[in-house]
C-alpha cells in the first residue's frame, strides 16, 4: 500500500514559514494565546494556575467528555457524545473514517476538485474512485444528475467537501438532501469534510449529519476557529 503525498502541503512545508507575505494561508488570522483566553472575559491567570496543578498523565485517551458534549451542541440532531471522536486534526479524522469504511474493490465517488486525501486515500486503500466534478457553468457547483449516473449498486462511499476546498462552493440544504437520497438508494455512506463549515452563514448552513443517518462528518478548530 502506498499513500501519495499532498502536493500543496509539500510546497507549503518548504515555503510558508519563510514568506514575507503569506497569501496561501487557509485559516483566518491566528489568535494569540492571550486573545483566546480573553474570550471568556478573563485574563488567563486562572487557566494557567489550574494548568500548573495538572499532572502530566495520559489524560482522556478516548477524548474529553466535556469537549464531546459541547461539540454535540453544534448540530441540530440529538447526537450521542459517544459518537464524536477526537482526532489529530480533520485530516486525521478523514483518515480514520476512510480506513474503517473503505476496503479493496469498493466503489467510491469523490467530489472533484477537492482536498486530495478525500480521493487519494480511498485509491491507496484499493478502491475504485470516480470523480463527481464541479462545473464552471453551474458556478462551480456539482450536477446531481451526474451523481445519479455515477452511483452503482456497489457504491460504498460518496466523499464531499462543504464548503469546497479549494473552490469555496457551498452546497445548499436542498443539494445535500438530494445527495443523501442518491446515497440511500444504494445504501452508501457519505463522508462530508466540513472544516470550512462556519465560513457560511451558520443559520443557513446545514450539516450532513443532520440530514443523513449514514453520514460521517469531520471538522477542526484550526480553520475558521483559528485555534
Predicted regions located by residue number:
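Generic structural signal for small/hydrophobic residues in well-ordered secondary structure
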Residues: 23-26, 71, 84, 108, ...
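Hydrophobic/aromatic beta-strand patches that form the interior of the parallel beta-sheet core
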Residues: 19-21, 31-32, 109, 130, ...
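Conserved active-site segment immediately N-terminal to the catalytic lysine
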Residues: 204-225
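Active-site phosphate-binding strand-loop segment of PLP-dependent enzymes
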Residues: 136-202, 209
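A short helix->loop->beta-strand "cap" motif at the edges of active sites that frequently abuts
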Residues: 106, 127, 185-188, 213
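Short, solvent-exposed loop/turn segments at secondary-structure junctions
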Residues: 26-30, 91, 115, 164-166, ...
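N-terminal small-domain helix-loop-helix segment of the aminotransferase-like
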Residues: 2-89
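PLP-dependent aminotransferase-like
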Residues: 44-45, 73, 100-160, 173
